[in-house]
Design a protein with these regions (language model features):
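Ubiquitin-like/PB1-type beta-grasp interaction modules and other compact soluble beta-rich domains
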Residues: 1-71
Length: 72
């Protein structure tokens, strides 16, 4: 059995562990966050939602995910 290395990512202020080669898209899906009406910030820079499949996370990254909800 292969042991995967883990990395620490702070997601919305909460420290979490993930496999070391995780991409932003996979993390968002793992957390069951819908991709429509969402803004993602990685280390204080907004990620273009069209490019999240290509963005790999690194140890000690800080990710902020904001999901917009309609209403009045």
């Amino acid at each position: 059995m292969k042991i995967r290395n883990k990395i620490k990512i702070k997601v919305n202020g909460k420290k979490m562990l993930f496999d070391e080669n995780i991409m932003v898209i996979n993390l968002v899906k793992k957390l069951k966050i819908p991709l429509n009406k969402v803004a993602i910030e990685l280390n204080k820079k907004i990620i273009d939602i069209k490019k999240i499949k290509k963005v790999k996370l690194n140890n000690n990254d800080i990710l902020e995910i904001v999901h917009f909800i309609g209403g009045g």
